[in-house]
Amino acid sequence: MKELQVPIHPISSMQGAFAESMLEASAGSSPILPQSESTSAASRRQKLLDQAIEEDTHASKWRQRPGQRYHELWKLMAQISFGIYLLLNGIAKDDEQVLNILQGHVDEVDAFLETTLEDFDLAIKDIQERLKFLKMPLENIHIFDAMLEDRQFRLQIVTGNERIEHIIHRTASAMKDALKDVQQGLDATKEFAIYLAEELEEPDWKMSRPDMQKVYDAMKGNAEGWYKAYVALQTKGNHLGEILVQLGSIVAEMDKRAGKISRKMRVRILCLHVRSQY
C-alpha cells in the first residue's frame, strides 16, 4: 500500500494535527464529531443531571480518543487553514469543492460554540436560581433551625441536598470538560488568526486571485468571531465555577446545621427517656 504523502502545512504548529487528520481520513477512521444536537439546551441539561456521576458528559465527546495525539478542534482548524492556503495560492484542484468542505468545517466549529454557549448560559441560570432559593433559609437562620427540629423536615433537607450535590458534581464535570475543549479551540484559533494576518501583508494572491478577497474577509470574520466566543466561554466558565462553589458551601452549611439539630434532638430524647425511668 502506497504511503500517504502529507503536504507541508502553512502553519507549522498545525502540521501534526493536519497529518493526523489526513491519516485518519485515508484509513477511513475519521471519528464522527458530535453534531449540534437537535434537542434543546434544557433537554441536554436534564439528560446530564439524570445521568450517574461517573458517566461521560456531552462535552467529553470532543476529547482525544485512544491513539490520537491532537484535539479535534485543532484538526478542524488545520483543515480550514489549509483550505484557505490552497484557495489563496490558486493550487486547489476544484475551488468550489474546497469551499464546500470549508463551509462544512466552519459549521462544525460554529455548532460546537453555539451548543456550549447555550449549555453554559442555562447552567448559570439554573445554579443562580438554586443559589437564590437556598440562601433564603440561611438568611432566616433562627426560623430554619426551629424548623429543623422536625424530623421529617430534616429528612427532606438532607435528601434534597444529596440531589443538589449530584447536580453540582455533574455541572462541574461538564464545565471542566467543555473548558478543556474551549482552551484547545482558542489556541488553534490564535494560530489561524496569526496566519491570516500574515497573508494580509502578502500582495501576490491579491493580484493573482482578487476573487478570493471575499473568501479571505469571510474567514477573517469567522476567526474573530470564534476568538470572542471562546473568550466569552472562559468568562462564563469562571463565573459558573464560582457560583458552584457558593452553592456547595450553602449545602454544606445546611447539612451541618441539620446534623447538629439531629444530635441535639437525640440527646433531648435520651434525657427524657432517662427521666421517665425515675
Where do the protein language model's features map onto the residues?
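Eukaryotic extended alpha-helical scaffolding/oligomerization regions
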Residues: 2-261
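Long, low-complexity intrinsically disordered regions
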Residues: 256-278
